[in-house]
């Protein structure tokens, strides 16, 4: 009888371990599936009757490094809370970025306030030639080969939103061909056509 009780207790412990493993594999895996980049953290003050109240704002870029990216802005009394709010806000504004392999389909320019960002496709192995705010957006979006130039404002908030505007302005070659009434062969880059001819997915 005592031996049976010990065996029963052992199986209960294994069941508890299995439950812990299952419970720990959900939200943690979902969180790790995204790439997060904190672009800017600022301290702001609100003047009230009793003095000034300080809080923090965080500009965060979140993406899956596979064509999906979003930007969020969080505000809280503590920096970690502001970042967490920014991450949740970014996830609400996810959008898809058209890509050809590891680069973008065509040159594009985005503008936001006084910020202007120019993006150009690059050959494999070039890497992300960009400054901090632009690089954060491109890496989270999964664009690994691209040339960029930031014109105008150096404010990271304007630069990030200008980069997002540029990525939103991208179109796949099929969309461009349909809009112009041309065959895909006249619009698509040669590398894309070669890849499709070889049976690779683009």
Swiss-Prot record:
Pfam families, sorted: Ribosomal_S5, Ribosomal_S5_C
GO biological process, one term: translation
GO cellular component, one term: small ribosomal subunit
Record field: compositional bias (Gly residues): 1-13
Domain S5 DRBM: 34-97
Bias-annotated ranges (Basic and acidic residues): 14-23
Listed InterPro entries: Ribosomal_Su5_D2-typ_SF, Ribosomal_uS5, Ribosomal_uS5_bac-type, Ribosomal_uS5_C, Ribosomal_uS5_N, Ribosomal_uS5_N_CS, Ribsml_uS5_D2-typ_fold_subgr
Region annotation Disordered: where it falls in the sequence: 1-31
Keywords carried by this UniProt record: Ribonucleoprotein, Ribosomal protein, RNA-binding, rRNA-binding
Tagged with keyword RNA-binding: yes
PROSITE patterns: RIBOSOMAL_S5, S5_DSRBD
Molecular function, one GO term: structural constituent of ribosome
This protein's record includes keyword Ribonucleoprotein: yes
Biological role stated in the UniProt entry: With S4 and S12 plays an important role in translational accuracy. Located at the back of the 30S subunit body where it stabilizes the conformation of the head with respect to the body.
Subunit organization: Part of the 30S ribosomal subunit. Contacts proteins S4 and S8.
Family: Belongs to the universal ribosomal protein uS5 family.
Domain-related comment: The N-terminal domain interacts with the head of the 30S subunit; the C-terminal domain interacts with the body and contacts protein S4. The interaction surface between S4 and S5 is involved in control of translational fidelity.
Protein name (database record): Small ribosomal subunit protein uS5
